[in-house]
């Protein structure tokens, strides 16, 4: 698993400090963008409330619980910047779970774009090119592990 530079860690921690305290509203911004990029992803969410539209999903308590979980994964990554390998098993398993429910790996890129969108909207002028790159570096590490788990789960099903 790759490592981040000390500068990347500093930028990520500094930007997450305020965002991490208010996870759900920031997560809603992120998922709103995700559903703009790929409305078909709405069909993957099966809750008591039908996620036929972005607004249906974003007003569903069950979906907001999912948003919270996603934001907690980001929080865990930020909290473990000095020891990202400690998250590897968790991320591999997360990739397996996403493969099992029909998420394709292309969607990981759209989630990354949505994360950057949320950061830009939330941070305003504090969102700089170096900060964007630092988050991209972290996200690429997270996605690499999730993609391995995703692929492994697909291989297991093929056997």
From Swiss-Prot:
Keyword Iron: yes
Subcellular compartments: Cytoplasm, Cytosol; Mitochondrion matrix
Enzyme nomenclature, EC number: 1.7.-.-
Annotated ranges, domain Globin: 3-151
A cellular component term, taken from the record's GO annotations: cytosol
UniProt main location, coarse: cytoplasm
GO MF, any single term: heme binding
Keywords on record: Cytoplasm, Heme, Iron, Metal-binding, Mitochondrion, Oxidoreductase
Binding residues annotated for heme b, in chain numbering: 66, 98
An individual GO BP term: cellular response to hypoxia
Domain of life according to the entry: Eukaryota
Presence of the UniProt keyword Mitochondrion in the record: yes
Top EC class for this record: oxidoreductase
Reaction(s) catalysed (UniProt annotation): Fe(III)-heme b-[protein] + nitric oxide + H2O = Fe(II)-heme b-[protein] + nitrite + 2 H(+)
Assembly mode: Monomer. Homodimers and homotetramers. Mainly monomeric but also detected as part of homodimers and homotetramers.
Family that this chain belongs to: Belongs to the globin family.
Function (record text): Monomeric globin with a bis-histidyl six-coordinate heme-iron atom through which it can bind dioxygen, carbon monoxide and nitric oxide. Could help transport oxygen and increase its availability to the metabolically active neuronal tissues, though its low quantity in tissues as well as its high affinity for dioxygen, which may limit its oxygen-releasing ability, argue against it. The ferrous/deoxygenated form exhibits a nitrite reductase activity and it could produce nitric oxide which in turn inhibits cellular respiration in response to hypoxia.
PANTHER family: BLR2807 PROTEIN, NEUROGLOBIN
Stated name of the protein: Neuroglobin
Organism: Dissostichus mawsoni
Gene: ngb
């Amino acid at each position: 698993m790759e490592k981040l530079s000390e500068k990347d860690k500093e930028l990520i921690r500094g930007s997450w400090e305020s965002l991490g305290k208010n996870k759900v509203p920031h997560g809603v911004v992120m998922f709103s963008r995700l559903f703009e990029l790929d409305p078909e992803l709405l069909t993957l969410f099966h809750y008591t409330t039908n996620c036929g539209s972005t607004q249906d999903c974003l007003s569903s308590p069950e979906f907001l619980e999912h948003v919270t979980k996603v934001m907690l994964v980001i929080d865990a990554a930020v909290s473990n910047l000095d020891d990202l390998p400690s998250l590897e098993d968790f991320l591999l398993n997360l990739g397996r779970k996403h493969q099992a429910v029909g998420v394709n790996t292309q969607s990981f890129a759209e989630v990354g774009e949505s994360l950057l969108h949320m950061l830009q909207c939330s941070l305003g002028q504090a969102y700089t090119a170096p900060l964007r790159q630092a988050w991209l570096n972290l996200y690429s590490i997270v996605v690499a592990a999730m993609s391995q788990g995703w692929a492994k789960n697909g291989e297991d099903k093929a056997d």
